[in-house]
Amino acid sequence: MEQVRNYYQILGVPRNATAEEIKKSFRKLARQYHPDVNPNDKTAEEKFKDINEAYDVLSDETKRRELDSRLFGRFRRPPTSRFSPNSNGGRSPNGTSVNGQVRTPTGRTGTRQPAQSWQDFSETRRTKVVSPARPVPRDVEANLTLPLEKAYRGGKERIRLEDGRSLEVEMPGGMGDGQRIRLKQQGINGGDLYLKINLSPHPLFTLQGTDIACQVPVTPSEAILGGAIEVMTIDGLVKMTVPAGLKNGQKLRLAKKGFPNNQGDRGDQLVEIRVEIPPEPSPEELELYRRIREKETFNPRQKFFDF
């Protein structure tokens, strides 16, 4: 015969505890026995599981009523208040009333009352104890904010749920902003965990569908002469050959360096060129710019004189 677990005792609350009292006790115990606070402590880990199981039942009114029925039954329910002599009175587990004068089987009066009849008492003795139902699997939903690189690569991630549990889950790669993924049997009592992925802002990249947009600074000489420059991608630094005569704001494309779609095909990286002037040119650089000025034929203000 399977014994009914007393979740009130596990959480250290009375049977008539309010929902707020139950939550307060749960949070206190969850912090005390949390695996992060007690690493490699199997006893604390089991206690933490018991606390979560108890809170799952006691925080649900339907499950709590079912637990009360199995724990206390019809005749084993403990009294919560004294009864007046005029009331029917409560019954203790041995079939006698809690207080008041009673009539014995011989017809005499005594200081204790028997149950309503010997038949009632006999029926109580024959009552079958019902085994508790197995914990019902419950799905859990949670939000998870990740940096772009982590969402792209995937891997292990530790998450903390609102009920106090901490889980380490293996995340798949290529998760987009707003995507909802299912982690089997990571919920409560074997249910599933549904995670909504939110991507945190990135200092360099902006996700545009499966394309990744970024700005890349170049020097005046690189813009004029072209050549190979280094560009950061979510895979790391790559060499990119840019054409001569780059304009500020011009956009180039790095094929297959974007974010993957559901089929695993990657988008492109969109590179916007930003021509930057050296803030503190050296004397040699200044001399070269003077010589260029003497030789250059381009006048960007010529259009002002065309009117």
Curated annotation (Swiss-Prot):
Q: Which InterPro entries match?
A: DnaJ_C (IPR002939), DnaJ_domain (IPR001623), HSP40/DnaJ_pept-bd (IPR008971), J_dom_sf (IPR036869)
Top-level taxonomic group: Bacteria
List locations, semicolon-separated. Cytoplasm
Q: Where is the composition biased (Low complexity)?
A: 100-114
Q: What Gene Ontology terms describe what this protein does at the molecular function level?
A: protein-folding chaperone binding; unfolded protein binding
Biased region (Polar residues) positions are: 88-99
Q: What is its main location?
A: cytoplasm
The record's annotation in SMART domains points to:
DnaJ
Q: How is the cofactor bound?
A: Binds 2 Zn(2+) ions per monomer.
Q: Does the keyword Secreted apply?
A: no
Entry's CDD domains? Answer: DnaJ, DnaJ_C
Q: What is the protein's given name?
A: Chaperone protein DnaJ 2
